[in-house]
Swiss-Prot record:
One term of GO molecular function: ATP binding
PANTHER family documented for this protein: RNA HELICASE (PTHR24031)
Compositional bias per record (Basic and acidic residues), positions renumbered to this chain: 605-616, 878-899
The protein, known as: ATP-dependent RNA helicase DBP7
Short sequence motif named DEAD box, residue ranges: 397-400
Lineage, uppermost ranks: Eukaryota, Fungi, Dikarya, Basidiomycota, Agaricomycotina
Source superkingdom: Eukaryota
Residue ranges of domain Helicase C-terminal in the record: 597-757
Length: 948
């Protein structure tokens, strides 16, 4: 038969028998049920067979006895399939049901053969061995060929019946799990983490509500500046967890990268690092076991004492915030209810103060410390009670000034000392843990120390310091945000500018391409004037600036003026000159001097000192010099209702601080400050309307110029900057304009020229050329003041010489504008109110140097037998004794009386050594009653009687 022929057999209904699938495995109940079904099927098949042989018996259909099999999709038929007739007397066995892909199975043998093979005494076999077949003729059909995909005739184990399915109830008698606590907590939603950040407010930047309310209510700061919008989100992104314990398992906290802040002067750099410090340490105030004894956690370094004191004042204002506002203004019910403790205090360490007092502060603990580099390194090396191992912040403010003053090695020593103390403290904690504890472990060692470097300019020196002190720093600049805001306002997006900004945000500009950017609202002007008109032009300019303030014009921009000079001698001279001159009273001053001379002539020779100066005049001069050093401010008839102040590095610390405080105090009355470059860095002096650069900067070039003019036009307010330029220095204007500007596409900075005649006319007033006569009168008054006293003349000569020395220190790049050969020394002497020729000034200065006392080395060489104590007493005698160091007039008079009493029994001016030639020490003691015995007490008795 051909291979493509497939046979189909018709099975009569009477011969239909269900084939029971073999049962393997399973439960014992299933096996019993299978045996029972097999026995019933065998009985039914036997009954059907008997019915076929005896037709008279009633016919019972097999379908009524055996359950119907599952519906199987019939195999496809072909037209060429041959059908074979079935004999009526025979029963055709049903085909075996296999999978859909299998072909027809072999015909089963007859029931008789199947039954004959089973012994009568044997039990019914298992379902797996039972096979129901019906007898068919061997020649009834031929087996068709199997298709290629046909499987085996026996059922595969994978073809077992499907797993029985069960439908169960959702709820049973078992109780459902409940909440452990009796009261279910309310689930609160946190702040949105993917919401846009509002950088225009402190709240949007993530600042604490306590600090926001304090800034707005007490300090008048409502919105952040550009540099604060840039750096605050990053520096506030890693708050402290006060509940963290040492040794807690969890993800290790990665420390923040160090920060480099570059922004203009007056842009808010101080608050940019003070706010993150205070907010980071504030959560520790909720812990009752944290107090000042924890040590120093933040250190701020400033280059000068004045800047350090200013930072300390701002920090104290921040730390005086009210903690009561936290619960009143808080809407978060889950906020920590633990109260705050006031353990955050600030401390100030500067040179010139008493180290003993500073050690007492450090022993108690100063969490936030403001210091100058030298004094901090001194305490790190010598003060064992200084606990700074846990320092979390180190701020270097005005880094460019720190490098200019030569603090690079000092800063490196500070960093090494901090690292050493940190390692020692960690090792001590480890040793204590091995021994069984005993100390509180610090849980924030893994945070490390965040180093912050602030500077208005970034040059090669600052880059070197950043490389040594910072670790993978992040640079923040305010100009980038301003450029982006301007670009958004114009609706432009330049890919070139964007790429330039991104490059500048990463790469620090080199010194040769650096641009120094002053505030854009600053009005910069310069005056080209002859050298001999400098002094009267300064007076005229100050009068015009002060008069506008007195009339109520531009009061909002400030009522104060700063005048920068090149030397400390020039500051002292101009301050005393403008404060001491008396217009129209020169004759009275001359008469007073004549009377003093007549009194001096009437004195006897015995009352004169060895140098020819009378004792009364000398003591009067000493008292006058003492009182002059204590004076903080002066008044001048040239500037009505105006106070004059001075500031330079050679002043005593107490005088410097008092002068700076008096000038910085807000007042409706105008004031003028004469200062050196010590006032050009970091000082936030409020209400400064104008800056006058009477002497152009000698060191620093454009950098120093920008820092000087940055004392005004701060925090968005207006201001003026004036520069005095001689005709030979006029090329400096174009040079400084080229040095200033912005590297991000802004237009350059231009200095506007103002005529000297306009300045004089506006300052002195009058019609036509009347200002010339008034300026001449002022110049003559200055010259008469210099001639009135030798001390004033010496002060003017020293200021003149200091100006020439400072003028010669301009860098090589500026020598084309500033050279001593270009100076007219005669006109320059006129600007210092001197009538002497420059040659005579040089001889007078050399004569003054020759009159100076011998140094200690020379004295020791001359008198090798002198003790150090004797030399110190000689030096004290030459300086005027203890009278100059007296705290009040009574103490000074007491010192003077004791010294006068000692002269009667002294030898060589030393009290306690008695004269007497040819006598040994024992004879002297016997004759005088003992060493240090006062022979006559009349002077002391007269002094006490006069006081009564």
């Amino acid at each position: 038969m051909a291979d493509d022929i497939e046979l189909n057999f018709a099975v009569p209904a009477s011969g239909l028998v269900r084939q029971v699938a073999p049962k393997k495995g399973g439960r014992w109940t299933d096996r019993v049920r299978a045996k029972r079904e097999a026995r019933d099927a065998f009985k039914s098949m036997k009954a059907n067979h008997l019915t076929v042989q005896n037709p008279s018996m009633p016919t019972v259909s097999a379908s009524e006895l055996v359950p119907k099999p599952a519906v199987i999709k019939p195999a496809p038929t072909s037209a060429s399939v041959s059908r074979h007739p079935q004999p009526k007397s025979q029963v055709v066995a049903p085909p075996r049901f296999t999978n859909a892909t299998a072909g027809p199975s072999r015909p089963a043998p007859s029931p008789q053969a199947a039954s004959s093979n089973v012994p009568k005494s044997a039990s019914i076999p298992a379902p797996a061995t039972i096979k129901h077949r019906t007898s068919l003729p061997t020649n009834a059909f031929e087996r068709p060929p199997l298709p290629p995909q046909a499987g085996p005739s026996r059922p595969h184990p994978a073809e077992k019946l499907k797993t029985p399915q069960f439908i169960s109830s959702l709820f049973t008698s078992a109780p459902l799990p409940g909440v452990k606590s009796s009261v279910a907590p309310e689930i609160s939603t946190g702040a949105p983490s993917n919401a846009p950040v509002d950088t225009t407010t402190f709240q949007g930047l993530g600042l604490n509500k306590l600090l926001i309310n304090h800034l707005k209510g007490k300090m008048g700061v409502e919105k952040p500046t550009g540099i604060q919008r840039n750096c605050l989100p990053y520096m506030l992104s890693s708050p402290l967890n006060p509940d963290k314990k040492a040794g807690d398992e969890g993800p290790k906290e990665e420390p923040l990268r160090d920060v480099l802040i570059q922004a203009q002067t007056g842009s808010g750099k101080t608050l940019s690092y003070l706010l993150p410090i205070v907010q980071t340490l504030l959560p520790l105030s909720r812990l009752s076991y944290i107090d000042r004894s924890i040590g120093t956690l933040a250190i701020i370094l400033a280059p000068t004492r004045e800047l350090a004191q200013q930072i300390s004042k701002v920090l104290e204002q921040l730390l005086h915030m009210s903690f009561a506002a936290s619960k009143e203004g808080s809407d978060d019910e889950d906020e920590d209810d633990r109260p705050f403790t006031r353990w955050l205090v600030s401390g100030l360490l500067t040179g010139g103060s008493t180290r003993t007092h500073e050690k007492a502060k450090l022993r108690k603990g100063v969490p936030i410390l403001v210091s100058t580099p030298g004094r901090l390194l001194d305490h790190l090396q010598n003060t064992m009670s200084f606990q700074c191992a846990k320092t979390m912040f180190l701020v270097l403010d005005e880094a460019d000034r720190l490098m200019d003053l030569g603090f690079e090695e000092t800063i490196q020593g500070i960093i090494k000392a901090l690292e050493g103390r940190r390692r020692n403290e960690i090792n001590i904690e480890k040793e204590m843990d091995k021994e069984g504890g005993g100390t509180m472990r610090w849980p924030f060692w893994d945070r490390g120390r965040l180093n912050v470097l602030c500077s208005a300019t970034v040059d090669a020196k600052v880059e070197r310091l950043a490389g040594a002190a910072l670790r993978d720093p992040v640079l923040f600049r305010s100009e980038k945000d301003e450029a982006e805001a301007k670009k958004k306002a114009e609706g432009k997006d330049d890919a070139v500018i964007k790429a330039l900004n991104e490059a500048q945000a990463i790469v620090i500009p080199q010194e040769s391409e650096e641009k120094f950017t002053p505030p854009s609202q600053l009005s910069q002007k310069y005056v080209v004037l002859p050298t001999k008109l400098r002094l009267v032009a300064l007076v005229a300019l100050l009068r015009s600036l002060i008069s506008s303030v007195a009339k109520g014009i531009s009061v909002s921009n400030g009522t104060k003026v700063i005048v920068f000079l090149s030397s400390t001698d020039a500051v002292d001279f101009h301050w005393k000159l403008l404060g001491g001159v008396q217009m129209g009273q020169q004759g009275q001053q001359a008469d007073g001097e004549k009377e003093e001379d007549e009194e001096e002539e009437g004195e006897s020779v015995e009352e004169r000192e060895s140098d020819g100066e009378s004792k009364a005049k000398k003591s009067k001069r000493k008292a006058k010099s003492k009182s002059t050093d204590d004076i903080v401010s002066l008044a001048s008839p040239l500037f009505p209702n105006t106070t004059l102040h001075r500031l330079h590095g050679s002043l005593p610390l107490r005088t410097r601080l008092a002068s700076l405080k008096a000038f910085a105090t807000s007042s409706s009355q105008p004031s003028v400050l004469f200062a050196t470059s010590v006032a050009s860095r970091g000082l936030d002096l409020p209400l400064v309307r104008a800056v006058v650069q009477y002497d152009l900067p000698t060191e620093g070039g454009a950098n120093e110029y920008v820092h000087r003019v940055g004392r005004t036009a701060r925090a968005g307010k207006g201001g003026e900057a004036w520069a005095f330029v001689s005709p030979s220095e006029e090329g400096w204007v174009k040079w400084i304009e080229g040095k200033m500007g912005a590297a991000e596409g802004k237009s350059g900075v231009n200095l506007g020229q103002v005529g000297v005649e306009d300045v004089l006319r506006k300052g002195f007033g009058g019609k036509s050329y009347e200002y010339e006569a008034r300026a001449t009168d002022v110049q003559l008054s200055f010259e008469n003041w210099v001639l009135a006293s030798e001390q004033n003349a010496a002060l003017a000569r020293k200021a003149f010489a200091s100006f020439v020395r400072a003028y010669s220190t301009h860098p090589l790049e500026e020598k084309q504008f500033f050279h001593t050969k270009l100076l007219h020394l005669g006109h320059l002497a006129k600007s210092f109110a001197l009538r002497e020729a420059p040659a005579q000034l040089a001889s007078a200065l050399s004569a003054g140097k020759s009159k100076r006392p011998k140094s200690k080395a020379a004295s020791s060489a001359t008198h090798p037998g002198k003790r150090k104590r004797d030399e110190d007493e000689d030096e004290m005698e030459e300086r005027g004794g203890k009278e100059l160091t007296a705290r009040n007039e009574t103490e000074r008079r007491m010192y003077e009386a004791v010294r006068k009493q000692g002269r009667t029994i002294k030898s060589g001016g030393k009290l306690g050594e008695f004269s007497g030639k040819g006598q040994n020490k024992g004879q002297k003691a016997a004759a005088t009653g003992g060493e240090f015995h006062i022979v006559n007490t009349g002077e002391l008795e007269r002094l006490v009687a006069r006081r009564k």
